[in-house]
C-alpha cells in the first residue's frame, strides 16, 4: 500500500463532484429574507396552483421537437428550441407588480456558472441562444409561456420549479416528478453542435429506431437487422445512467465530443464496469452469445436494472448499443463496417504476414491480425477544438482494442482528418488510419534468422467501408470518405502527411506494391453451404513466352471474424507446369467432414494460397475469407396489423444439419410492436422444425420490423426478419 495520504478538501470549501443525473437535492419551497411580520400570510401573494407541460405524444411540444416517438410520459424537448408550458395561479397574474421565473436544476450541487442551475427569466422578447420565457397568453388565472433553452444546455433530466417573488423573499413550488423535463441534443437547431441540415439524414440517423449492420466478408457480404429501440420505455433513463456510471461531470454533458468519448469507453466493460463484456473466444458461459442479441433494448435495460455489465458482446453488438446511446441523446449516428480491417499491434501502418520457406503461413510469427470486418460508429458534430473543415462525421469505437488515455476507448476521430493524414488531431486518428489504410506485407522468415519481403498488397486493408443507406436496407459505400484511391497523388500526400505527424511505417513500401512477375495467380471459392462439400479453384496465368514450374501451397483455416486462426483444417501442396502464354487451373475439394467439427459461430473459413516460381524465385500470395451459407429463421404474422389490435407472431426454424442441436434459444423483438422475448428448446433433431407463437399489440404505426435469432451449442448466427406496415387505429 502507498504511504501517501489521500487528498482531502475539507479546508478548501470545495463543492464535491456533480456527476450524477439521478442524484438531487430539492430546492427549498421558501427562501425568505428575514422574518415575516405577524399577521402576514404568504398565501395572499401570487401562488402557483398547477403547472401544465403539454407532454402527451400528440401535444405540440413533442411533435415539434421530434420526441413523440419516445415511450415516456415526461416532457422531452431538444435544446435551442422553444417549447410551451402553462402555469395556473391563485389569482390573475399582473405583470406590472408580479414577478416569477421558471427554474431548472440537475444534479446534487446545482450552480448557475456550471449550467446545473438555470434560472429562466420572463422577458418581453426571446434572444437567440439564450434561456428565456415569454408570456404568450395571460387569461383569467393562467399564463402560457414560450420557453427557449440554450443550444449549449446540458443534456439530461432536469427538475423544474416555479419561483415567485414576494416582499419577504421567494416562494417556490414543491418538487414534483411529473414536471421533470428531459433536454436532448438538437440536430434541427442551427446553433447546436450536432446540427445536421438534411431532413432525410436526420430521419435516418436520429429518428430511425431500426437499422441494418453489415458483416461477413468483402467477397461475401451479409447483413442483419438490428433493433436500436432508442425510443422504447426505459431506454432514455438507461442512457443517462451510462453517463452516471462513468461519473461524468454534469457540466460536460452538453458537449457531444465529451459525451461520445465517454460513451465509447462505457459501452464496453473492459476497465470501467461498462455495459457489455466483450468475448471473442467462442465460450459464453453464464451469459448470452453475442450472435443471439437482436437489438439494444434488452441489453441496456438489463444493465440499468442490474447495474453490472451484461454478458456478452462483440464489435457489431457494441456498435449497435452505442448507436442507440447516441441517437437516444440526439446525436446523429450510424454503424460503420470496415471489411479487411487491420488491428495493427505495433501501429506502423503495416500488417506483417510471415511465411515459412516452403510458402506456408507461420502462425507463430504472425502477430498482426486482419479482421474479416470490424464495426464502429460515426457521430455527427462540429469540432471547435480542431481547425475548420474537420467537423462532420467522427469515428467513435467502443470495441476494446487499444488503450487511449488510460482507458479502452477510441475517438471521436475526424473522418476528414483521417483521410488527409492529419493524425495529430485528437482523438485516436492514427489507430483509425491504421484500420483502413495499412499495407499487407508478406515476409519469408529464413532459417538463418533473416527476413525477406516477398510481396506488398496496398489494397487489401480497408477494402470496403459501408453503412446502411438512407431510407432503405441497402448498403452505402463510404470508402472514399476515409481514404483516397490507391495510387492517386492525393493518397500519397495523405500518407506523407500522416508520417510527418508521427504515424510510423517500419518498411518503405513505395514501389513494392506488387512483385514483378510474368505469372498472375488468383483463386475462387464456390458457394459454400454449411454442412456441404465445396471446391476452391486456383488459376495461374502465364503472360510470358517462358516455361515455368510452380510449387503452390494451400492452407484452409477455421478463423474468428477477427482474423485469428483457431484451427488449420486443410493443407495441400501441388506443382503446376505453365507453358508459355497458358492458363492452368487446380481444383481442391473441401469436404464438410474436414471443417464441421472445428467450426466457430460465424461460419468463417480463411484460405491462404502461396506459390513460388522455381525459375525466378518470385513468390505469389493471395488470401480470401468465405462465410458459409447458414439457414434462416422464418417469421410469420396473422391478425390485424393495427395499433392496439392483437397480432400473432410465429417463429419457425428447421435444423438442416445431420446432428441434433442442443440448448436452443430463440430471440424475438420489434420496436413499437413487441418487447424483446426469448424461448428455450432443449433440442432440435436433424430436419426437425420448432415453432414458437407470441401474441402482441403494436403501439407504433408505420413501417416496423420484427427481428429474430436462433442460437445453440453448435450453430449460431442464424437470423430472420419481417417487415410490417402497422396501420393507425381509426378515430371514433
From Swiss-Prot:
Domain of life: Eukaryota
Organism taxonomic ancestry: Eukaryota, Metazoa, Chordata, Craniata, Vertebrata
Note describing how the cofactor binds: Binds 1 Ca(2+) ion per subunit.
Gene3D superfamilies to which the protein is assigned, alphabetical: Immunoglobulins (2.60.40.10), Transglutaminase-like (3.90.260.10)
Enzyme class: transferase
Name of the protein this chain belongs to: Coagulation factor XIII A chain
Active site residues according to the UniProt entry: 315, 374, 397
One Pfam family cited in the UniProt record for this chain: Transglut_core
Record-level GO cellular component terms: cytoplasm; extracellular region
UniProt region (Disordered), positions on chain: 1-26
GO BP terms in the entry: blood coagulation; blood coagulation, fibrin clot formation; peptide cross-linking
Keyword DNA-binding assigned: no
EC code(s) of this entry: 2.3.2.13
Site (Cleavage): 38-39
UniProt xrefs under PROSITE patterns: TRANSGLUTAMINASES
Modified residue annotations for N-acetylserine: 2
Glycosylation sites: 614
Entry binding sites for Ca(2+): 437, 439, 486, 491
